[in-house]
Amino acid sequence: MKAVAVGTLALALTCLAVPAFAQASNDYCQGKSLTLVVGSPPAGGYDTYGRLVAEHLGHFIPGGCSIVVQNMPGAGSLRAANFLFQQGPSDGLTIGMIQPNLALDQAFNSENVKYDLRKFQWIGRIATAVETTVAWQSSPVKTIQDAKTHEITLAAATANGLTAGFPRVMNAIVGTKFKIISGYGGTAAIVLAMERGEVEGGHMGGHSLLSEKQDWVTGNKVSVLVQYSQTRDPGLSSVPAMVEFAQTPEQKKILSLFAATTEIGRTLVAPPGVASDRVAALRAAFAAMANAAEFRADVEKRKLELNVLSGEALEQMINSSLDISPSLAKVAEKAWTGQK
């Protein structure tokens, strides 16, 4: 995915100019350590990005500081989000990396939600987490329009996860006929099921598809039916984003909520009470890190995706996505869970 990552980065960095005022002052971190709370267990994808940031970000915070990763898994980052929101120190020495599914938990008014994403202070996004649905070459389904007239079996990991949730949303809102078969352990099992002909299609992460299974796309082994995003990823520019299938403003609002979860991606946040000048310093440090040649080289070495977005742009996206009426949020929740 080398060409994709570099091209995406070039587009994104135009928005990440480093504010001079933040560079010139605010050395609150000097001689101290900053804690990065990662709402995922060690060795996973979010942990990998968290440790990448921990190695580089401190060099760009005025005064310089070391960064210590603290893993706080639980309920898809809900535990970490609640901690940061309710107990996160306001001194700018604790930040977090939490999973984007938290937007759905908040929109669905889940009982364990103690946070409000709109009150977090967003530092920046490192990478998206765009997901796709693909159909194997033997399937008559080549487009979403085909999937509205022909039933197609899709492999999914669990009944409650995103590999089943996104296709269910397409069924409920767009009118596709995805028959979801859950119980496959993860991406590797889904890939094997398609190759063996057990199912006609499945759910794939966009980065996995382009980096590990690029021959599927270039060799026409699969048709990529949809990417679950608000805008088309540069690496999947010919694949429609899910919001493009909205026929009404209500449908667009619902689909935008789901699409935002992948666009939020791997992001850094600060607790609500951190002073504005320290938030500005963290945002400037993030922008400087994203522009740094050594950081980009490390990303390429690790074969990771890089699609950065400023904290200000993230804040706007989240506020817009969560600006949804209770009645539409209920429709969205039923679509996600498969309720009638």
For each predicted feature, which ranges?
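Bacterial N-terminal signal peptides
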Residues: G7-A17
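Short beta-strand-to-loop elements that line the ligand-binding cleft
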Residues: S66-G74, A155-A157, F178-G186, M204-G206, ...
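Hinge/capping helix and adjacent helix->loop/strand transition within the periplasmic-binding protein
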Residues: Y28-Q30, L34, H59-G63, F83-T94, ...
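Sec/Tat signal peptide C-region and signal peptidase I cleavage site
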Residues: V18-A22
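A ligand-binding cleft/hinge motif common to bilobed small-molecule-binding domains
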Residues: P100-N112, A164, R168-I173, G201-F245
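Extracytoplasmic "Venus flytrap"
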Residues: T35-G50, P73-G76, A155-L162
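Extracellular/periplasmic bilobal clamshell ligand-binding domains
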Residues: S310-K340
